Each structure stands twice: as structure tokens, then as C-alpha cells.
A protein has these predicted regions:
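Surface-exposed loop/turn motifs in large extracellular/passenger domains
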Residues: 1-546
Length: 546
């Protein structure tokens, strides 16, 4: 015990201060408590102890800075794609995909006695810098499996899962995507973060694709980021840990401005085409999840506060289909088209799109006794036409869930949720993505009728929440949507925002909520629309091919 008070921990710092292009340069600026850049490969039972500070420009993680799928364009001297490439069928391609995906099994990081701090300093959002996570900053097709035994093998009766844990966490700071466990997760096949070397995988497959969509789905799923059996806890149960997206910048005249990270969450900042948890083991008992019986559960323990810009949530900031798969996903006015997705639709099976959705099973968020406070500060307009949506969304569990599913999850000890536009006790914005705009798709109404033939529009484009609940602190939790007095053209055609607040969900656009509850709600406040359970619902369908 005497020696314990003299453990000072160790620091990991990547010195590069700004993004640069060039060979081996765009990947740099990453740091992790165990590994900096992990491109492919497997780690089993690798533990890092007494980590004090991890700091980097592009990506910082308590365990790994970045996990990236290796480039599938060439492997040694063998060219896989292209004019001289090997013509692999998609069955063989699946094996190739798995070779290029990085895997971490049964490995954890423990901060030093006074808590671990993870910081990502990059402000160049365009090039994907500024990602921070308690475990990993950026994962592109990464696999993190804590639901196995210590040797990375499947559990047998009587054996406890080793976990992929972050313990003794004090604070995570970043300027792009910030999360208690992971900054940003996306699929290796559809990466739109600046990974350069590894982003062309799906395009290479499509170029050699003829008409086997079922096989394509299996390849896509092999490169989806999956996280199971991951747990985040603080160093001090009374104080907990914070996810802080606020930072200050100075202009040429020395004036200081406070800015905020795009996405912040108690577990994940941003999720794209990711699967968290296991649908088969998350059944629990009755309608509620039972983490004690679910080795793949994802838990957040001792969360105090989450502060972000466009999206903030107790578990995740933004969970979306990959913007590669979204026509209406960019900033309003941007070039709204995605050739990649249109090629997938022309393949003839809308079911391919399932591979782009984000799924969360058995995510549990437990706040400190004072309660969790979640704040989102920045309002922007995304999408177009009937796919237009506003950011500045906050929720006790998630800020924005766009084309995703959350099942058997809960938030406990919620104090307050504050956002600019869509704010909810559980999720601020349950929405659809502008995956297809009929005039951009050039598919004709016959092709669009595939929606009715192969899947319901709601199943592919809507967002679902099932068997989940939010529980406030004993004094009750509050939900507030406010522009803080700013003029945003309220209720006009030129409005730059829309205040919608609800006790469980703020704005539910083409959404399904089933078997859910909110307890200890105190007050819901909005300048426009407020509801005890849901602020506003809409079923504006996505494809309008008149």
C-alpha cells in the first residue's frame, strides 16, 4: 500500500503537430497506451497498466491510437485488383477481407492511480484529425472482442469473460470525435475518414463485381467494426470521468473563441457501419437486458458529463450509416451524390444496405450519484429537401441515431440533457438518412420498387429503439432544447433550426420505438415543440419518385 502511492504512471505522446501528406506522413500523429498504429494483425491478452496521459494530433487512445484495415490494393508483390489483378470470386474475397482486419482480444488498459487522460489535439476536421477515445481513437474495420476468455477463446461454462476494458479513466478530450471508449468507428470497406491507404477496399470489390449481392454483404460485414464485452469505468466513483469536446482557439488578433468537437459520447463519439454488442447474447431476462448474463455487454460506469458540438450523448454522439452510403449526409449545399451507393442499389438487392447500419445491443450507461449532464452546442443544417435535418442534437444515451438500431439498452442516473435542436432523455434525433434521392439515383421507378419487394422502407432507412429505458436521478432529469436567445428564423422557411424536445426521444423521423420507458422525468423545455415521451414524430418517406 505504501508503494501504491508512488506509482506515477507513464505518458505516451506523438509529437507531430499538424497534418501532412506524403508517404507515411498522413498516418502519423497517433498514440496509444499499448500500440500507436495497428494496421491488421491480432493482439490477445495484451494488458497496459498505469497509463497516465496519451496525447496525439490525429488519434489518441488509452490502448491503441488507430486500428486500420490494411490496404487491399496490393499485398507484397501480388496485385489483388486492377487490370493485372487476380480475379477472385467473392467467396475467396471474404478470406482476403478477414486477413486485412485488425483484431484485439481480451486486452485492457488501466489508468494510473489518479486517473488516465487521453487528448487528441488536431483541429483539421477535413483530414480526420482530433479523434480521442479511452481505448482507441480511430478504428477502421477494427475488431475489439472482450467477450472471450483470457486466451481469446470462446467462453465455456463457469469461465468469466476477460473483457476489453478501460479502467481508472479521468478525462477524454478531442476536437473531432471524442468517446469514453472509442473516438470514431467505421467499416474498413466504406471508410470516409482520411485513411488513404485503406479506403479503397470496397471500390475494388465493386469494380470486379458482377451480380452476387449476397456474397458482397458477407464481405462488407467482414470489415465492419465490431466491439463486444467492453467496459469503461472511472478512477474515482464519486467524481467519475468526463468526455470533453470544448476547446479554445485564438485568431490573428489574439481573440479567444470556444469551439466544440463534432461528436462526443460517454462510450463512442461517432459510429458508422458498426456493430456493438451481440444480438444473441443480449436477450437478458424478460424485456430488460441482464448484463450479468451477457458477456458481450457494453457498460459505462461513473460518467459525469459529455460536452460536444453537433452531437452529444451518454453512450454515443452520432451513430450513422457511413456517409459513403448517404446521399443526404453532407453539409447542406454540398454536392449531394454518392456513386458508391448507387452501384450497390444497381446490384439488385437493397439488403446490401443492412451492412451499413449501426447496431447497439445491451449498452448500459451508469452515471455518478450527481447525475450525468449532456450538452450539444452547435447547430448546422445537413441533407436536402425532405432529408434535411439539423444538428445540435443531444440525448441521455445518444445524440443522433440515423439509420441504426439500439436494443436492450439503458441510462441510469441522468441529470440533464441540453441541446440546440433535437433533444431527448434517451436519444435526441431518431432519423433516416437521405440514402437515395430519386432524381440523383437515375434508377427509374422500376428499380426503386425493389424497396417493396425485398424490404420495408422502415427496416432499411428508419431507426429503431427497443426494450430500452432512461432513469433519472431521484430529483428528476430535465430535457432542454434552446438556441439561448439567438435568432434562427424560428418557424419560417428560412429557419436554421427547430427546437424539439422529448422525455425519451426528441425528434423521431421514420422511427420505431417499442417496449421503452422513461422514469424520474422532471421537466421538458423547448421554444417550439415539447413532449413528455416524444417531442415530434414524422413519417416523411425517403424515396419520392413521382
Amino acid at each position: 500500500k505504501f508503494l501504491e502511492s508512488y506509482i506515477f504512471g507513464f505518458n505516451v505522446v506523438a509529437g507531430r503537430a499538424e497534418y501532412r501528406t506524403g508517404a507515411n506522413l498522413h498516418d502519423s500523429g497517433v498514440a496509444g497506451g499499448h500500440v500507436g498504429l495497428m494496421r491488421t494483425g491480432t493482439i490477445t491478452d495484451g494488458q497496459s497498466m498505469d497509463v497516465k496521459t496519451v496525447s496525439a494530433m490525429r488519434a489518441a487512445g488509452g490502448y491503441a491510437g488507430t486500428m486500420e484495415s490494411g490496404s487491399a490494393s496490393s499485398f507484397g508483390s501480388i496485385q489483388l485488383f486492377g487490370d493485372k489483378g487476380i480475379k477472385l470470386d467473392l467467396g475467396q474475397m471474404l478470406d482476403v477481407a478477414q486477413v486485412f482486419v485488425p483484431v484485439i482480444k481480451s486486452s485492457s488498459v488501466a489508468g494510473y492511480r489518479k486517473g488516465m487522460k487521453v487528448v487528441a489535439t488536431g483541429e483539421d476536421i477535413t483530414h480526420g484529425t482530433g479523434n480521442a477515445g479511452g481505448y482507441v481513437g480511430l478504428a477502421v474495420g477494427g475488431q475489439i472482442w472482450g467477450d472471450l476468455d483470457q486466451n481469446g477463446q470462446k467462453l465455456v461454462k463457469g469461465v468469466t469473460a476477460a473483457g476489453a476494458n478501460v479502467s481508472n479513466l479521468r478525462k477524454v478530450e478531442g476536437r473531432n470525435n471524442v468517446g469514453g471508449f472509442i473516438g470514431v468507428a467505421t467499416a474498413g470497406a466504406v471508410a470516409d475518414v482520411d485513411t488513404n491507404a485503406s479506403e479503397g477496399f470496397l471500390q475494388g470489390i465493386l469494380d470486379s463485381l458482377v451480380s452476387t449481392p449476397a456474397s458482397l454483404v458477407s464481405v462488407l460485414q467482414a470489415t465492419v467494426t465490431t466491439i463486444r464485452g467492453a467496459h469503461v469505468s472511472s478512477d474515482d466513483p464519486a467524481w467519475g470521468y468526463t468526455v470533453d469536446g470544448a476547446y479554445e482557439t485564438k485568431d490573428d488578433k489574439g481573440n479567444t473563441t470556444t469551439k466544440y468537437a463534432l461528436n462526443a459520447g460517454g462510450f463512442a463519439g461517432s459510429l458508422q457501419a458498426s456493430i456493438l454488442g451481440d444480438k444473441d447474447s443480449a436477450k437478458g431476462t424478460g424485456s430488460e437486458a441482464d448484463p450479468n448474463n451477457d458477456p458481450a455487454a457494453l457498460t459505462v460506469t461513473g460518467l459525469r458529463a459529455v460536452e460536444g458540438g453537433q452531437y452529444a450523448g451518454g453512450f454515443f454522439g452520432l451513430a450513422d450509416v457511413s456517409s459513403v452510403a448517404s446521399v443526404g449526409g453532407g453539409e447542406a449545399g454540398d454536392k449531394q451524390n454518392t456513386n458508391l451507393l448507387l452501384k450497390l442499389l444497381k446490384v439488385g438487392n437493397v439488403g446490401v444496405l443492412e451492412a451499413f447500419r449501426t447496431f447497439i445491443y445491451d449498452g448500459q450507461v451508469n452515471g455518478v450519484n450527481d447525475g450525468i449532464q449532456v450538452v450539444a452546442h452547435d447547430s448546422t443544417t445537413k441533407g436536402m429537401l425532405d432529408s434535411k435535418r439539423y444538428t445540435g442534437a443531444a440525448g441521455g444515451f445518444g445524440g443522433g441515431l440515423i439509420n441504426g438500431s439500439v436494443k436492450q439498452s439503458a441510462v441510469t442516473n441522468l441529470n440533464s440533457v441540453t441541446g440546440v435542436n433535437y433533444v431527448g432523455g434517451f436519444i435526441g434525433h431518431l432519423g433516416k438518412s437521405g440514402t437515395v434521392a430519386a432524381d440523383n439515383a437515375q434508377l427509374g421507378t422500376d428499380a426503386l420498387n425493389l424497396l417493396g419487394a425485398t424490404a420495408g422502407v422502415l427496416d432499411i432507412w428508419g431507426s429503431h429503439v427497443g426494450d430500452s429505458r432512461v432513469i433519472g436521478i431521484p430529483d428528476g432529469y430535465t430535457v432542454t432544447a434552446t438556441h439561448h436567445g439567438d435568432n434562427y428564423g424560428k418557424a419560417t422557411d428560412k429557419a436554421t433550426g427547430r427546437e424539439v424536445a422529448g422525455g425519451f426521444v426528441g425528434y423521431a423521423d421514420l422511427a420505431r420505438v417499442k417496449g421503452c420507458a422513461s422514469d424520474n422525468l422532471k421537466k421538458v423545455t423547448s421554444g417550439e415543440i415539447a413532449g413528455g415521451f416524444v417531442g415530434e414524430t414524422s413519417r416523411a418517406y425517403l424515396v419520392d419518385a413521382k
